[in-house]
A protein has these predicted regions:
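Alpha-helical transmembrane bundles and membrane-interface segments of multipass inner-membrane proteins
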Residues: 1-192
Length: 192
């Protein structure tokens, strides 16, 4: 297994530790800080694995499969933790998670089609990813600040900001999902 794939695999391995610290705020001191550090390391591996794979000609089918899967597992885990903690609405999270499954399904169908179509990320998909990652990071940081007493949830609109960020992510997620369905409807018709 090459270095790029090891970094991708590390991201998957970090997910349960991230979830543990996110959900152990009552037991582990500074658990949100630890979760943020793990999320940051996982995010860095996401950038590093692709750059290393391309620069050193380490692109593999395993990496092409595992990299987007690792991203989805990390983001979906964060969003589920947010719902459990009351930081995000279940319906917003459900829309984001459903879109991930739908687009992944479209990609699998396209890749398995006669034309072996590879679906690249669209600008809407990139905006969706960026908005979701920003939302996750900002929401965790706000709760770290509350945890450390730097701000209070009563004086600072933590939940309102969290909701706005998640709604923006949800809107971009919905637009992106509809665009994928529209752009690749022929692939779906052919293989349905």
């Amino acid at each position: 297994m090459n270095l790029a794939n090891k970094l991708t695999l590390l991201r998957v391995i970090l997910v349960p530790f991230f979830a543990f610290f996110m959900l152990s705020g009552d037991i582990v001191p500074y658990s949100y800080l630890w979760a943020a550090i793990i999320f940051a390391v996982a995010s860095i591996t996401d950038t590093a694995d692709g750059k290393i794979a391309r620069k050193y000609n380490m692109v593999t089918n395993f990496g092409k499969f595992l990299d987007p899967l690792a991203d989805k597992v990390l983001v979906v885990t964060a969003l589920i933790c947010f719902v459990e903690l009351g930081w995000a609405s279940a319906w917003v999270t459900a829309i984001i998670v459903a879109r991930e499954f739908v687009v992944s399904g479209i990609r699998l169908i396209a890749a398995g089609s006669e034309k072996k179509t590879v679906i690249a990320a669209s600008i809407w998909g990139k905006l969706k990813t960026a908005s979701t990652m920003v939302a996750i990071c900002v929401i965790i940081i706000m709760h770290i600040l509350v945890d450390f007493g730097a701000i209070t949830a009563e004086a600072f609109p933590v939940q309102l900001i969290s909701d706005i960020l998640m709604y923006i992510s949800c809107i971009l997620t919905t637009v992106s999902g509809i665009k994928y369905l529209w752009d690749y409807r022929e692939v779906l018709k052919t293989d349905a």
